[in-house]
Amino acid sequence: MKLTCVLIVVVLFLTACQLITTDDSTGKQRYQAWKLRSKMQNSVLSRLSKRCDEEGTGCSSDSECCSGRCTPEGLFEFCE
């Protein structure tokens, strides 16, 4: 009987030690997901707010220059 009680106490003690020393990663994962979501939203918002390409940047048929002029210079085209 005493041996059974000792074994139960030892098992409870070891379980408690395991729970105390275990790294709680659930909160960290939630924070990382929130951080990634925020980063993606900022990226989408920055792309949506940019309406035209600045002077000197490369341009093509699917991009719009702020000046409205995309001029070829050698092999590439640049916004004026």
Swiss-Prot record:
One of its GO terms (cellular component) is extracellular region. Its main location: secreted. Pfam families: Conotoxin. Keywords: Calcium channel impairing toxin, Cleavage on pair of basic residues, Disulfide bond, Ion channel impairing toxin, Knottin, Neurotoxin, Presynaptic neurotoxin, Secreted, Signal, Toxin, Voltage-gated calcium channel impairing toxin. It is found in: Secreted. It comes from the Eukaryota. Disulfide bonds join 52-66, 59-70, 65-79. InterPro entries: Conotoxin. Expressed by the venom duct. Residues 1-22 form the signal peptide. One of its GO terms (molecular function) is toxin activity. Residues 23-49 form a propeptide. Peptide predicted to begin at Arg-51, but it seems more probable that it begins at Cys-52, since this position corresponds to a dibasic residue cleavage. Belongs to the conotoxin O1 superfamily. Omega-conotoxins act at presynaptic membranes, they bind and block voltage-gated calcium channels (Cav). The presence of a 'disulfide through disulfide knot' structurally defines this protein as a knottin. The cysteine framework is VI/VII (C-C-CC-C-C). This is Omega-conotoxin-like 1. It comes from Conus capitaneus (Captain cone).
